[in-house]
Curated annotation (Swiss-Prot):
GO cellular component: Golgi apparatus
Protein name listed in UniProt: Protein SBE22
Biased composition (Basic and acidic residues): 56-66, 127-138
Residue span of region Disordered: 1-66, 107-240, 331-359
Gene that specifies this protein: SBE22
Length: 813
């Protein structure tokens, strides 16, 4: 609340002031609350609030220079209390950083005419914005108007101030206007403020007009009164900043810069001024340094790091190629030693010799820690004062001896380091080796520090691992590698044991043949060994012949055509072109386009199939595969043996009864195959006679390699063997019988071995095809069962695993 005025009294009414544009402006401070947020940005340096305290600390320091009675009376009676802060409204900062950053250092405290013009224009807008509130707060506006009129009327002799050079705003004092209480109060307020400024700028000749904050109503008015005879224009900087109503105005910071006065800055203003000046100074330093470096870029000696030899002619220096090999002290010590050495060389006299001697001793003690430096090679140095030698000559001889010792030692050191790095280059990660091969980095120049920063488990272009993380990873990797090493050792042990076992089994085959392979005990041993090791190539033909027909060889002699007879028959019969095309298409489809195409097809294969086509049996399923593999195998010496063995295998192991048994038993609902396949719905589309039959069985053998094919035939032949030693064949008895009688009495029908083979493939290697029938249509030539040879190095181990699973399912029957 405003205290009652004792001297001036109250104004009965508030006059209106008409501007140049014809508007009536009243209630000068009626919109004080409405423009409170913006009015706080002005700096009321000469005003005081409620309790007589200045709004800034600098205002309080100069209260004593004004008229005490007049000032205190006006402040206590006329000024109202500051308005309450409305916390719900947004407040702008009094002075923003933009006011400093957007102003150059040379313009930071200057006010040009453009500032005055902008101030006036803003003041005009503000006055128009606030003119509508005159009637709402007459009391507040009358109080502020009283202050304004008092300061205006305090000017004597009818003086008039014109605000700005080009502004229409003027504050006039005349005899007629002096009678107005509002104008008297305003004149007194301006007078008091100007007395403050004169006291603050006592040493200045020209008085400084006040800087009035936005709490004053004068900046928001336009006065248009009659011109007087004696008018004095106020300088631009005096009221211009007062008229400017923006928070980021440079003029709002220091209003009196235009008059040359020095007003005390607030701490925030001094801080921002120092900040701006330091930034300008930093920019200047950077520009000067960049200019210096740009000028030095053209100097080749500075680019290469060369130093004039005249500066260090007597200083022992290391060669560039071996500098990195030396275990010297830290860079700080080396820099200190080198600088002291250069200083000592320039300083003459005894002090120079003493300093040089101490420097050389420190240098010697530094490099003596390196084991490669041999100081025993250095000759005895003269003693100063005893030997007739000058200090300069002493220093020169000492440096020469040190240099010779160093050069000789560095040569040995470089050789030893290079040899160590050559030996350790093989232990570097593959990334470094590949980079070295491409010319990016020399492995011989990789230091131990770099090796500590790299890791075998992280690419070289990524940041190095943390030491703890690196240790943890190395432990895990070491553990994994140790386990893998143990597994590999087990595999190697198993492989070695298998090799030994294979050699042992091959020797057993020989012993079984010598002891008579057709004995019952021998056949039991043979059936046990055959799952571990295939039959020897040199014994295969003999074992096949003995276990399938014994020494009587009745099947070959009586139930099949001899090779000579079939050759004679082929010479008399000429095959048609259609038959030849069928034979060649059969070879192409079942051999060349399948796994058998990896091996060279024998030239006799077409002949053997032609002979088989004109025989009594004709070409049977699997004949082309049997002829192909037996022709390229080393077990059979001639075509006669191949012809006899193919016919013998077909008549004993794949005869009609075996095929019929296979077709019926494999689809038996209570059989072994059904117990496995019917448990999985994925087999329901192939558990039928169209997919599972004796003809589709041969589609599997089209996809196996030669070694596994021969091993499979070895097992099938062995499982169809009979102990002819215990029940020999009587030739006279079977000399007149047909093949069916002989087969029923002397041929073993073993379909279980064929069904178990198909079951093994269906359960464990059923990938790449839908069923056994579609297996023949797979176009991939490299598709192989159990696995392609290109995908695995140890194919023998894979074959052994395949046979082991086959044995497991065979035991189920």
């Amino acid at each position: 609340m405003i205290r009652p005025r004792s001297n001036l009294g109250t104004l009965p009414e508030e006059p209106s002031v008409e501007s140049k544009s014809g508007r009536t402006l009243a209630g000068i401070t009626s919109s004080r609350k409405e423009s409170g947020m913006r009015s706080r940005t002005s700096s009321g340096s000469a005003q005081a609030v409620g309790l007589g305290l200045g709004r800034r600390p600098s205002d309080n320091l100069f209260h004593g220079h004004a008229d005490p009675l007049d000032t205190m009376q006006m402040l206590s009676e006329a000024l109202p209390q500051p308005p309450k802060i409305e916390h719900g409204m947004r407040r702008e900062r009094p002075i923003s950083n933009d006011s400093i950053m957007t102003t150059k250092s040379s313009e930071i405290f200057s006010t040009s005419s453009s500032d005055t013009q902008s101030n006036i224009s803003v003041a005009t807008n503000d006055s128009e914005d606030h003119s509508f509130g005159m009637d709402k707060s007459v009391d507040n506006s009358s109080t502020n108007a009283t202050l304004t009129n008092r300061s205006i009327e305090n000017r004597s002799n009818g003086d008039s101030y014109s605000i700005g050079e080009k502004s229409d705003v003027s504050v006039n004092r005349s005899t007629k206007s002096g009678n107005n209480p509002l104008q008297r109060t305003q004149s007194e307020t301006i007078s008091v403020n100007m007395s403050h400024n004169r006291s603050m700028n006592g040493a200045m000749k020209q008085p400084t007009p006040p800087f009035m904050g936005k709490n004053s109503s004068i900046p928001n008015l336009r006065y248009n009164s009659q011109p007087q005879q004696d008018n004095r224009s106020v300088p631009n900087g005096e009221f211009g900043s007062k008229l400017y109503n923006l928070s980021n105005s440079t003029s709002a910071i220091i209003p009196n810069a235009g008059t040359g006065s020095k007003l005390a800055l607030t701490p925030s203003q001094r801080y921002r001024l120092r900040k701006e000046q330091s930034e300008h100074a930093l920019r200047d330093v950077i520009k000067r340094k960049e200019k210096l470096y740009d000028e030095q870029d053209g100097i080749i000696e500075l680019q290469e790091g060369d130093i004039d030899g005249s500066f260090i002619f007597n200083v022992p220096m290391s060669s560039y190629s071996t500098t990195s090999f030396l275990n010297t002290t830290r860079q700080k010590d080396s820099a200190t030693n080198s600088s002291s050495t250069i200083t000592e060389r320039i300083t003459p006299g005894e002090n120079q010799s003493q300093n040089n001697r101490e420097s050389n001793m420190s240098f010697a003690s530094t490099i003596s820690s390196t084991s490669m430096l041999d100081f025993f090679e250095m000759p005895t140095s003269p003693i100063p004062g005893v030997n007739k030698v000058s200090d300069f000559q002493y220093l020169q001889d000492t440096t020469k001896h040190l240099s010779s010792v160093y050069l000789h030692s560095s040569t040995k050191l470089s050789k030893s380091k290079l040899s160590e790095r050559t030996a350790s280059a093989d232990c570097l990660p593959l990334e470094f080796k590949e980079a070295s091969e491409k010319g990016m980095e020399d492995l011989l120049l990789v230091s131990e520090n770099k090796l500590d920063a790299v890791s075998h488990t992280r690419p070289s272009w990524l940041p190095p691992k943390d030491p703890e993380e690196k240790k943890l990873h190395e432990r895990e990797i070491s553990k994994t590698l140790s386990m893998a090493s143990l597994d590999q050792l087990e595999k190697n042990k198993d492989r070695d044991s298998k090799i030994i076992k294979d050699e042992t089994n091959k020797q057993k085959y020989v012993l079984l043949v010598d002891r008579n392979i057709t004995r019952k005990s021998s056949l039991q041993s043979l059936k046990k060994i055959i799952w571990e090791t295939p039959i020897n190539a040199e014994l295969r033909n003999h074992i096949y012949d003995m276990v399938l027909q014994s020494e009587a060889r009745l099947v070959t002699e009586r139930f099949t055509e001899s090779f000579d007879d079939i050759i004679k028959l082929s010479n008399r019969i000429e095959l048609t072109k259609t038959k030849e095309i069928e034979i060649r298409n059969l070879i192409t489809a079942n051999i060349e386009n399948k796994a058998g195409g990896k091996y060279d097809v024998s030239d006799d294969l077409v002949l053997m199939l032609k002979l088989k086509s004109i025989s009594q049996q004709g070409i049977l399923p699997g004949d082309e595969l049997l002829f192909h593999h037996l022709l390229i195998d080393d077990s059979f010496e001639n075509l006669n043996q191949v012809w006899e063995m193919v016919n013998l295998i077909q008549m004993t192991c794949f005869n009609e009864i075996t095929k019929d048994k296979f077709d019926s038993k494999i689809l038996e609902k209570s059989g072994v195959v059904a117990s496995y396949m019917l448990q999985d719905d994925s087999f329901k589309h192939e558990f039928n006679a169209n997919c599972l039959n004796s003809n589709t069985w041969w589609n599997i053998l089209e996809r196996v390699n030669h070694d596994l094919f021969m091993w499979i035939i070895d097992i099938i032949v062995t499982m169809n063997s009979q102990p002819f030693k215990n029940s020999p064949i009587n030739k006279e008895k079977y000399s007149e019988v047909n093949w069916d009688v002989y087969r029923d009495n002397k041929v073993l029908i073993n379909y279980q071995i064929l069904i178990s083979f198909a079951l093994n493939v269906l359960l464990n290697y059923h990938f790449g095809f839908n069923d056994l029938k579609s297996l023949a249509d797979v176009k991939d030539k490299n598709f192989c069962i159990p696995i392609s040879e290109e995908n695995y190095l140890d194919i023998d181990e894979i074959n052994s695993l395949f046979v082991g699973k086959w044995k497991h399912y065979f035991k189920k029957f």
